[in-house]
Amino acid sequence: MYLCSMIDVEICCNSIASAVAAKDGCADRIELCRDLECGGLTPSEEDIAYCVHHLGLRTHVLIRPRPGNFCYTEAEQMEMIATIKRCKELGAKAVVLGFLTEEGKIDVEITRRMVQLASPMEVTFHRAFDEALQDPIEALWDVAASRCHRLLTSGQRPSALEGAEVIKSLIGVTGVEILAGAGVTPMNVRELVEKTGVREVHGSCKKSLDDGTFVTDAASVRQMIDKTLTL
């Protein structure tokens, strides 16, 4: 049975084990990826299908074919298009992506094309926004012009709490929902929400394993959700 929170909590999951832990912690929405150690890459089709159909989670799928910058070649874009189409077929709720131009600005043209291809799935523009060489409000308007439903951001700072002032300034400017993420934990989520006014938060609630990788911790997920119940 899921807990009912006025704050929509999204858990970043890098594997099936993490997705199971997120569900055990009463989450019902995840961002699914792999290789979180390098910032996250596109997960496998098998993992997407399992999370959607077996776990019954609202699954937002990261579309990122490689580590590094967010300026993609035509071949990489074609790969991303194929993945987006497959996510739609598999029943994903949303895809998560981001494109920058060679000048470091939001690539409105390519992003809008991907949003159109993804429909009726929602599209979240990810933290490529935080690397954009633009004023955050200007960049937000570009995200809006791309027709994205949501923006995942730390306010162009290393953590969402550090970027709280910028995050607050983004809310309500356009119709884009602001999802605060980066360094969000059960210990600081209340402070973040109170400082910014966001209604959506993103965290991994992860613990380190002996091999240097990470996995979602169900107890931390439950604590995160508990902390948001009275906000």
For each predicted feature, which ranges?
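N-terminal pre-domain/capping segments
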Residues: M6-I30, D35-T42
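Hydrophobic faces of well-ordered beta-strands that scaffold small-molecule active sites
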Residues: I7-I11, I30-L32, T59-I63, V95-L97, ...
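Catalytic cores of alpha/beta
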Residues: N14-D24, G68-R86, D130-S146, I167-A180, ...
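Active-site-adjacent beta->alpha loops and helix N-cap segments on the catalytic face
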Residues: A17, L36-L57, E74-E79, F99-S119, ...
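A structural motif
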Residues: A27, G56, G91-A92, P120, ...
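Ordered, amphipathic secondary-structure segments that act as subunit-interaction surfaces
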Residues: A82-F99, E103-I106
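Long hydrophobic alpha-helical segments typical of transmembrane helices together
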Residues: E191-L231
